[in-house]
Amino acid sequence: MKIGIISINMYSKYLNFACPLHTFAFQQFLLKKGYNNTVINYQPIYFNGFNMKHPYTYYKNCLKTLKKTNSLKINKIKDYEQKKKDFKKIYKEREIRYNKFQDFIDNNYIKTEKCYNSASLEVESLDYDCYICVTDVIWKNEPHEGFDRGFFLGSTCMENKLKISYAASRGVNFAKTEEETKEFFDYINDIDYISVREESLKRYIEENSNKKATVVLDPVLLHNEDFWSKYVRKPKETEYLFLYYVVEKASDTIEEAIKFAIKHNLTIIEVTDRPLKYGRIPKSSKVKYKYLYDIGLEEWLGYIKYASYIFTNSFHGCCFSIIFQKHFFVGKRNGDKVTHLLEMFNLQNRYFNNNIEVLSNNPSINYDNVSKILEEKKNISENFIINALNKKVTKEKDYSKDKKNQRYKMIYVNKKRNSITDKFNDIESYEVEEKQLNTGENLLLPNMFKSNKYIFSHWIIYILIDKDWFYYIKDKKIVNVKDYNNEELYEFSSNDLIPYFSVNGIKKVVAEAIWKDN
């Protein structure tokens, strides 16, 4: 069986340490069980050409574009200005951190050479027998983008193949409207075996559909300390408190870490995924501390393994604290994933946001009990994925109905190509008022453009799928404009049928007028 894994993996904009590690952990788990598999190099829909190595350059270019178009998106401009400023300050550190992440991925992943996105998975065949979408927050409703079809295994190349979700999570951004809720359940109804990371998502799925969901461990917890120790780089620092926070400002986590470190005469090693030059520990504080941004995955694991204490608001900070059996405390975090993890292992007393006394009492952790629970949960998780992979699924679903129900903007344009320099009269573009159904039954309009020097020859068609443009070529295939190699384009006459396009995610179809000498 050929297995393709789709996950966030290397495309975390803030270079979150967990993203490459949980994908790596799942791949290694399958290999250990005898299942060959490949990580699909997949860019999420929200990626938008982001420059992973130099985000400063990305935001700088975005701002130029926004200002050129006289955009009134004031809040977006302010946000980009701040991010540009922040990433400029850590320009060198970011490059170092990025290179370390890439080295780990290049040395440890089995992955596709080619990079795919939601649009390319509509027209290219990957030829896997089974597709598994793997944690982390892959089922979120991304603001301004929506759900990512690839993370739901809803791409055309995956049709009628075995589909499994492992430890999927939805995060804090989720379906808000009836339409978004329908879209979510349309996606998961086509997944054969569903497992999720949080109990709340399991309840949501089972209460609103006929699908069953199993709660499983995050992939990093499928491996023990011995496994992860092989990828640890031991830090030179000793007797330190490791402070690791993500996403939020984490003021409570930072404040309590400072108090604890002073009380116990410990140096703080501060690490975050935020683009900060000097961290968030105030210089005026009386604590000894060291802030690090330019570290890699092995160093991050090392700081956890050899820490005297850990303060974090991170889900995976908690996971690796459990794996390495560390004394750790947890600050406030939005969402329920951290809460669920602590409840799973009866470690609610690690939270200090509701019980500050935990810091003065400094309770120990009974890792014998934690280990028993971990083994039980491992068995459930392993059984889920192995049983799912061993089931034979014969699928002959017709996906054309949903594809034909897509509506797209139909636009006619009049561009100057080749040697045409004539000034065309009247309109230069025309958008059909009503969106077109993708049925293959709509007719192309007669040419509505005029020229004094040339006569109309034919139409060519290109299609916007998600955010990528594709040509419709002579052999009735769709080719990405970026990959176009002068293949002959299909020539349409007026009143020809607009083809049915057997893809998802159609946003626009453009018919361009082509002219010839009079």
Predicted regions: what they are:
Residues M1-K404:
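Active-site anion-handling motifs in enzyme catalytic cores
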